[in-house]
């Protein structure tokens, strides 16, 4: 339902009351529309990335699960369980494990009530880790009793296969031998980590605190144990905090080629292993290498305390043989700067012996360090791959998502090592988790203005790290105006068009002022306020050091003069495109923090400072029309320790004393004083500002001033209203002052026609709303500190109606939000990093009416081919387990049928954007809303042959190939023998000729 209609008028920039009226009757009932939530509730705890579907799942401290995709794709699941400890995305399912060992399975491939899981299963043991692969329908659970059990995702049950605790017999052997590191009887080592071989699904690495085990699912036996023990007197033994020389395993990572792996330990060391050797190839830490061996000539370095290694990932480039290791932590504790270490290994050595690889891992091709300078210390990192979903999710990553200790997020560009602007790459809601993210303004502009600044989007366009999901088109709620949500991160500004109910990155203008202000850059500077002109593509923003940046569209015909006034500084940017927004100049009067930044619609800017300063700027010069202060005007109250300062301003054309109309600037202060300035043209063609009068109101903190005429039209100064300057006005202008403790309505400046005082609750935000449900001139809608919304009619200020905001809005942070004249509001919620978006001119919509978004857009059964072992290894007898073989090994010959049904003839729709696709992915069908609710993507068909029959087929195929090679070698041998015989005959003939010719030379 719309409460506004469009009215044609001669002036295209007039927003009158008739523009905002509807065809509804005056007694129509109104209620609040709760439209959407932007941001993230409280703090992130866990995360999981499904690169096959391009989805990212993050668990918040409120036990909510947010699932993100491309653009503004977002779904929220609130499971009915205890604290979530593990999540996994596999085969278009979300697997959730809580602290009570309950497994919940949520299907994501269709629209349904995601609050109810498809299956619930109760485990007997605690899950310590999970791992999966995009080509299988299984999730491996590492258990607290040391076992590994597979979870059948599509059958919602555990598999028949189980890996027992592989260290139980080994512990018994240690106790029999009397080793000091043997655990006490009855103590079971839990599983620390499980990793699937990057080229063989039938081989897994299982990490226990005591060591690492290479296990074959195909043969159901242990291949090898890997246990690190330092040599006596070695560097690692000297630095080790343990009495015995065996560190505790903390994690493992496969190499991309699968012949090596790395394990890292609680004493900040990490070891490289060859899968064919029981002894480490190389053991090192951040400082030194070969720290596990001892030689009589070596000198132990001074003891350096290292911080623990928090995480380690072994990634590869487009070519899997070119790899690098990312290590979070492991630095010396006395290091002044923390960061992430990168060890690059570009080319594998041709010689495969242990000594060569020991030297290879000891001396990386390059070693880089990414310091945490502008962000807090990091406690976890997430690799976002850009190519295939294989190689344990670390194939050619471009970005790294960092979770800091203060629960903020940052995005690191791996190629440059710099912190990237998150609004350009990740979902908008996650931008709220940036450490320096701020919501600084919420206001309305005309559609014409938005169309003019929309060209700036292409300058810093959004490129999403995620590609999953199908975004909802939203709803067209506004016709001739746009709601702008303005946010900042440091000196970067983001302008979001949220008129359709979403923060869509494709409708976001990103401006970065750090580059143009590099000569004037102050460390830790950030933008605090911003003000847009409603009818012109220009705005101003202030930073934390009192500088005001003025931005306009680039126009080669409008150039700044060669010499500017004192306090105004030029910002030159030669790379600005014609017709795009850019920072033209900034104002720095050295007066402290900016308390008011008000951009007019007629080319003026009013600035208020913390010291009581008042500055009016004419953008046509630019010129400083007025630079004074409240104390210089003699209006400062005696006995007050802190100076009064401006908090609001309004530009209006009026004739307060019956004289010809002029341009006036009406300002309000924190202590309830109003100041009136008149702007007149001078003989030189410029404008001049003069102080006229002041008045003390019984209102504290006047944060909003509205002007309107007697017939209910907005009287804010616009380009068309300047035509009436110098002439009598046809209607009287009313001024409405709104503060924390009351409202006052004046006409003729000093004639008070309405007054309303309140103490509790406090009016935190208010707006002038013109609608058919309001009588006379309109209504003032006040949002109070108890979340109530009161409507007061103008000019008599009688209460019309009362509403209640959603209860999850934070009543203590209402001043951080705002409400607009069209009834839309933005207020922070109790979620700390979340905003509630709604409208007081609504019909009672709730979040349950929000259109759902499709998360699964790629067929889960069509995955890019998984890397496999080389042909030479295959000829030598090594077998790779396929996904179908793994289904039989884990689920048995009589595995139950999948509970996922298929459609017979799907219709193909567009897949992932071409610029972000490295390998083709098959999309799912295009569906209507009705068929989408029953659609589930097809899964792999059940393998018909038995396991032993498949082995026989593989052996026969290998025998045929080996037989062909044998025949080829026989042919080569025969050809070589014939060629040797020919050479032998030729040499014999040549020798005979030489002998005969020599004999002839002696015969006379």
From Swiss-Prot:
**Cell compartments where the protein resides:** Membrane
Q: What's the superkingdom here?
A: Eukaryota
**Is Disulfide bond among the key words of this record?**
no
What's a GO biological-process term for it?
A: exocytosis
Where are glycans found on this sequence?
27, 392, 418, 421, 627, 859
The record's Gene Ontology cellular component field reads: cell division site; cell tip; cytoplasm; plasma membrane
User: What is the name of the protein in this document?
Assistant: Uncharacterized protein C1F3.03
Which organism does this sequence originate in? Schizosaccharomyces pombe (strain 972 / ATCC 24843)
């Amino acid at each position: 339902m719309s409460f506004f209609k469009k009215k044609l008028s001669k002036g295209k920039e007039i927003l009158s009351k008739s523009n905002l009226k509807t065809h509804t009757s005056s007694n129509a009932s109104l209620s609040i529309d709760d439209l959407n939530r932007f941001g993230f509730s409280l703090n992130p705890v866990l995360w999981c990335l499904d690169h096959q579907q391009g989805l990212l799942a993050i668990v918040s401290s409120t036990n909510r699960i947010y699932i993100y995709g491309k653009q503004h794709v977002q779904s929220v699941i609130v499971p009915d369980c205890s604290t979530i400890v593990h999540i996994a995305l596999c085969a278009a399912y979300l697997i959730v494990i809580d602290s009570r060992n309950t497994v919940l399975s949520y299907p994501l491939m269709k629209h349904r009530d995601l609050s109810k899981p498809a299956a619930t299963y109760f485990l007997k043991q605690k899950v310590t880790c999970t791992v999966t692969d995009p080509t299988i329908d299984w999730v491996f659970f590492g258990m607290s009793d040391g076992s590994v059990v597979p979870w059948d995702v599509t059958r919602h049950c555990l598999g028949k296969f189980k890996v027992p605790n592989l260290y139980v017999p080994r512990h018994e052997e240690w106790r029999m031998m009397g080793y000091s590191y043997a655990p006490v009887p009855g103590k079971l080592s839990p599983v620390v980590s499980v990793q699937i071989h990057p080229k063989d699904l039938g081989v897994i690495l299982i990490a226990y605190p005591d060591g690492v085990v290479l296990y074959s699912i195909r043969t159901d036996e242990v291949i090898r144990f890997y246990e690190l023990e330092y040599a006596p007197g070695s560097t690692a033994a000297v630095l080790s905090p343990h009495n015995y020389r065996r560190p505790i395993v903390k994690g493992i990572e496969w190499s991309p080629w699968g012949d090596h792996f790395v394990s890292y330990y609680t004493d900040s060391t990490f070891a490289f292993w060859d899968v064919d050797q029981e002894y480490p190839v190389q053991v090192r830490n951040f400082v030194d290498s070969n720290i596990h061996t001892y030689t009589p000539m070596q000198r132990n370095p001074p003891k350096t305390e290292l911080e623990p290694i928090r995480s380690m990932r072994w990634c590869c480039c487009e070519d899997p043989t070119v790899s690098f290791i990312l290590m979070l932590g492991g630095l010396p504790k006395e290091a002044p700067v923390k960061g992430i270490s990168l060890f690059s290994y570009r080319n594998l050595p041709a010689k495969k012996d242990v000594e060569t690889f020991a030297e290879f891992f000891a001396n990386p091709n390059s070693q880089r360090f990414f310091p945490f300078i502008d962000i807090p210390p990091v406690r976890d990192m997430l690799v976002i791959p850009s190519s295939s979903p294989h190689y344990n999710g670390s194939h050619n990553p471009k970005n790294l998502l960092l979770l800091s200790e203060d629960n903020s997020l940052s995005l690191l560009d791996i190629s440059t090592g710099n912190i990237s602007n998150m609004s350009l790459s990740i979902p908008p809601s996650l931008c709220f988790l940036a450490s320096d993210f701020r919501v600084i303004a919420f206001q309305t502009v005309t559609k014409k203005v938005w169309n003019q600044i929309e060209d700036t989007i292409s300058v810093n366009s959004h490129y999403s790290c995620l590609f999953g999901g199908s975004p909802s088109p939203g709803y067209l709620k506004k016709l001739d105006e746009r709601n702008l949500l303005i946010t900042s991160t440091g000196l970067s500004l983001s302008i979001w068009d949220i008129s359709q109910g979403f923060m869509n990155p494709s409708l976001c203008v990103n401006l970065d002022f750090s580059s143009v202000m590099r000569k004037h850059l102050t460390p830790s500077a950030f933008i605090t306020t911003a003000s847009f002109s409603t009818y012109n593509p220009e705005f101003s923003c202030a930073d934390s050091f009192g500088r005001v940046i003025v931005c306009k569209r680039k126009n080669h015909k409008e150039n700044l003069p060669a010499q500017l006034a004192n306090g105004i500084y030029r910002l030159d940017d030669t790379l600005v495109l014609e017709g795009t927004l850019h920072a033209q100049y900034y104002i720095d009067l050295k007066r402290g923090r900016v308390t008011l930044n008000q951009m007019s619609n007629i080319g003026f800017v009013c600035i208020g400072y913390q010291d009581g300063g008042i500055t009016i700027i004419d953008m046509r010069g630019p010129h400083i029309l007025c630079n004074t202060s409240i104390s210089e005007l003699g209006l400062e109250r005696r006995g007050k320790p802190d100076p009064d300062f401006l908090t609001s301003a309004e530009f209006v054309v009026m004739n307060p004393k019956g004289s010809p109309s002029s341009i006036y600037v009406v300002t309000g202060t924190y202590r309830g004083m109003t100041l009136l300035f008149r702007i007149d043209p001078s003989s030189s063609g410029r404008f001049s500002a003069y102080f006229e009068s002041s008045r003390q109101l019984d209102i504290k903190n006047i944060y909003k001033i509205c002007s309107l005429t007697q017939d209910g039209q907005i009287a804010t100064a616009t380009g068309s209203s300047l035509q009436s300057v110098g002439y009598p006005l046809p209607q009287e202008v009313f001024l409405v002052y709104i503060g924390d403790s009351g409202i006052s309505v004046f006409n003729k400046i000093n004639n008070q026609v309405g007054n309303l005082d309140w103490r509790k609750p406090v009016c935190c935000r208010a707006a002038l709303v013109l609608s058919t449900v309001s009588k006379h001139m309109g209504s003032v809608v006040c949002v109070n500190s108890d979340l109530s919304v009161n409507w007061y009619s103008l000019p008599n200020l009688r209460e019309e109606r009362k509403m209640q905001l959603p209860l999850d809005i934070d009543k203590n942070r209402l001043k951080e939000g705002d409400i607009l004249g069209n009834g839309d509001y933005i207020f922070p919620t109790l979620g700390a990093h979340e905003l509630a978006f709604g409208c007081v001119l609504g019909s009672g919509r709730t979040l349950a009416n929000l259109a759902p978004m499709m998360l699964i857009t790629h067929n889960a059964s069509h995955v890019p081919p998984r890397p496999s072992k080389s042909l030479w290894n295959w000829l030598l007898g090594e077998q790779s387990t396929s996904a179908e073989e793994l289904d039989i090994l884990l689920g048995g010959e009589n595995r139950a049928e999948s509970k996922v049904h298929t459609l017979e003839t799907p219709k193909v729709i567009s897949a992932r954007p071409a610029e972000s696709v490295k390998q083709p992915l098959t999309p799912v069908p295009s569906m209507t809303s009705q068929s989408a609710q029953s659609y589930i993507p097809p899964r792999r068909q059940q393998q018909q042959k038995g396991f032993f029959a498949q082995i026989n087929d593989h052996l026969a195929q290998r025998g045929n190939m080996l037989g062909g090679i044998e025949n080829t070698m026989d042919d080569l041998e025969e050809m070589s023998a014939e060629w040797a015989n020919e050479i032998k005959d030729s040499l014999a003939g040549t020798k005979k000729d030489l002998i005969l010719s020599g004999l002839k030379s002696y015969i006379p």
